[in-house]
Amino acid sequence: TDSRKHFLPLRGTANGSLTRAAAERLGASSLILETTTREQPLSLRVRQHRVMVRTLLQEIGILGDGAPTLTSPKDRLDLRVAIYDGGGAGTSGPRNLEQVMKTIPRSLNWRIGPADILEGALDHFDVVIFPGGSGSKQAAALGIQGRDKVREFIERGGGFVGICAGAYLAAANYSWSLKICNYNTFCETREIPGVGRKSMWYRGPSSTVTMQLTTEGHEILGRGVEPFHIRYHNGPIMSPAGIPELHDYQVLGWFRSEVFHYETQRGTMVNTPAIVSGKFGKGRVLSISPHPESSQKLRYLVARAIRWVGGL
């Protein structure tokens, strides 16, 4: 080790053009990373920096060729949670989940994307959360290999929380879904007079519905003033899939009111599961159709859900 060589932290914004000119003039070996746009997921922007630093350290001989892009923290924490923010994830969900994580002592949360999952990033976590957005787009972003990685993570004992789109992702009835919980979603197409054939998953814009927990729901998620008034935005309407290879799910909460966009949807949501839990391999799965993470008063439900799938 050469004691004369060390890293210097910079203060303020670097002048990229001046840095390039200086490196060229001095003949210095340099790496310049242009910050990606804010429209890109945070996990992707952070990943770019990690990859750059790894490349730099490999270039100067500090790291070997097989060095990972992500490592576990030195301090052992009670709960390490990965929050998916890649393709198909909405913008507010990950932010709200980060607020939820602040209420869980001795925990760490980190945003991850499809590339991280493909590289084995889930090995560093106890729980993965897939937030609202689009379940099919999340599945497409993951690809077959990425979805297999998520399934393997849960099968080995990892925890999975799916909210709205994430609950669609966990379902058993799509070609692209993970099939980690034994429920179907109400997504068939029906003929609407004067409109044509429409899929039944769409029930209109964001709205408020009521939800009531079961005895099992109280044990896992805690108690509050019920029925809960909770935000709903086209989350899955769940019913048993009856797949022999999967464990039956347990209902933790029921919808006690409904919203519908088409008359044929009337009566198909009220008294159906709002929250279910199940097992997949050695792991735990918890799917939430509405959005408790959107309400500061209801975030404790999500915190309890995360702790439960994480084995705490």
Stretch-by-stretch model annotation:
Residues 204-284, 289-293:
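Catalytic beta-strand/loop cores that center a nucleophilic Ser/Cys/Thr
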Residues 136, 140-225:
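A glycine-rich, often tryptophan-bearing local segment used as a flexible ligand/cofactor-contacting loop or short
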Residues 28, 155-159, 283:
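A short helix->loop->beta-strand "cap" motif at the edges of active sites that frequently abuts
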Residues 36-40, 87-90, 134-136, 166-170, ...:
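Solvent-exposed loop/turn segments at secondary-structure junctions
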Residues 90-175:
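Helical hinge/lid and interdomain linker segments adjacent to catalytic or ligand-binding clefts
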Residues 49-77, 151, 177-179, 268-273, ...:
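Extracellular ligand-binding/catalytic regions of CAZymes and related secreted enzymes
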Residues 1-84, 91-92, 96-98, 111-112:
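Structured catalytic-domain cores with a bias toward divalent-metal coordination
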Residues 84-88, 114-115, 130-134, 255, ...:
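Structural motif
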